[in-house]
UniProtKB/Swiss-Prot annotation:
Plastid keyword on record: no
InterPro entries reported for this sequence: Leu-rich_rpt, Leu-rich_rpt_typical-subtyp, LRR_dom_sf, LRR_domain-containing, LRR_R13L4/SHOC2-like
Coiled-coil region: 106-133
Function: Leucine-rich repeat protein that likely mediates protein interactions, possibly in the context of signal transduction.
PANTHER family: LEUCINE-RICH REPEAT-CONTAINING PROTEIN (PTHR48051:SF54), PTHR48051
Keywords: Coiled coil, Leucine-rich repeat, Repeat
Family: Belongs to the SHOC2 family.
Lineage of source species: Eukaryota, Viridiplantae, Streptophyta, Embryophyta, Tracheophyta
Tissue/organ expression: Widely expressed but preferentially in roots.
Motif (GVYW): 393-405
GO biological process: microgametogenesis
SMART domains, sorted: LRR_BAC (SM00364), LRR_SD22 (SM00365), LRR_TYP (SM00369)
Placement of LRR repeats on the sequence: 159-182, 183-205, 206-229, 231-251, 253-275, 276-298, 300-321, 324-346, 347-369, 371-392
Designated name of the protein: Plant intracellular Ras-group-related LRR protein 2
Amino acid sequence: MDHDLDKFPLLSYVLHQHDSNLHAPPSMAAQETLLPSFPLLSNPEIMSMLTQSIPTTITQTLFVFNSLGSRPDPLAVSSARFKIAQIMDSLSPEEAAKESEIYAGVVRLDEVHDSYEKKLKDTEEELSRVYSTEVESMLRSGEEVNEKVLAVLKEAESGGTVERIDLSSQELKLIPEAFWKVVGLVYLNLSGNDLTFIPDAISKLKKLEELDVSSNSLESLPDSIGMLLNLRILNVNANNLTALPESIAHCRSLVELDASYNNLTSLPTNIGYGLQNLERLSIQLNKLRYFPGSISEMYNLKYLDAHMNEIHGIPNSIGRLTKLEVLNLSSNFNNLMGVPDTITDLTNLRELDLSNNQIQAIPDSFYRLRKLEKLNLDQNPLEIPSQEVATQGAEVVREFMRKRWGDIMAEQQQRIGVEAERHGDENGWVYWGTSMVTNLVSGVTHTIGFGGATSDGGDKKPGDSYFYHQI
């Protein structure tokens, strides 16, 4: 039985058609996604070309792949790498080699799995390319003609200058190979089709500035997308993406990225280090649980929409996004229980939506958001400020928090005076200094980590860290 070939449905299908005794058919689920994407597989000429394209070594590759057994859990591999690093740091090379042998075995097994999966993936992509080429041939001969697609292909092949291609809502199952010859392409719109993948060959479009593949059935983006160094606008919303490739961080010219309406569970770790020119980031309606720390490096970000996710906490470093004007963190429901004090460093913020969460208090330093015009705190168990105050808009909330801040300062000053009298003037100031150092350390402790509960599970007093930082 072939090893997990549902990851490579086209290869599995062609192998079964070639030798049904040796190779099992794809699962029903795989066939349901495969056949709509490759509707002409029943064509004898196409199937013949696909069969001839399969490497002669595929049987040996599958045999070895089957003999490997299950791939190690990613967490186990990560732990093994960590253990090896620890051992290498603490022992001599000879001792380390022996001590780390069992962990090295886990890593090697994972690497072998990765190597063989890459071979199968390459074969899958080659079959897809062959299929595309054969369909194009049919287009040229007048079969299955889509006039708009054919016109684009003819212009591209004639050597004409083509900078913009709009093939939105054309029921495309694949992207014709000839597209990758249009090296001067600046704008490509393939939205509203039935595409399930983007070939690696997209990297040939070096001048591409805007790519719209929204409203398709994409489950992944190719790593080669990171080679589109002139790309300024990327729209991949309304697909089936579970992750964005790490290589997207190389698209340093990106100004707008829309990855909303997908199934993303995380963002690439280094995304912020590369996308420092990004101004708009739309990641709403996904399954994100946290922001990577590097998001604070997106210094030019003006618009961030992350509503309808599963976000548990906001990194304190969000305060570094000082150009941010619109921030929507609404509808993270039971997951988001607080925001860090540093959110008040976003002094250019005009719109803030924190509705439909579990926030009990906003930072006491909230009055610093002087440019805030729109504020939505609905559907939160608010205590500070009260629901009555919160519903009256940004200006009222800002004034309420300004007064509260003044009261806190006055109370602190009065407490210092009382302590000074109680301990004597000199000793009182010593007490005050000790108290302030202790509180400052406490504030820093609260500041490290994410907005919401403290590391020991207790609730943080809103505004404390900012208060002591200011003093």
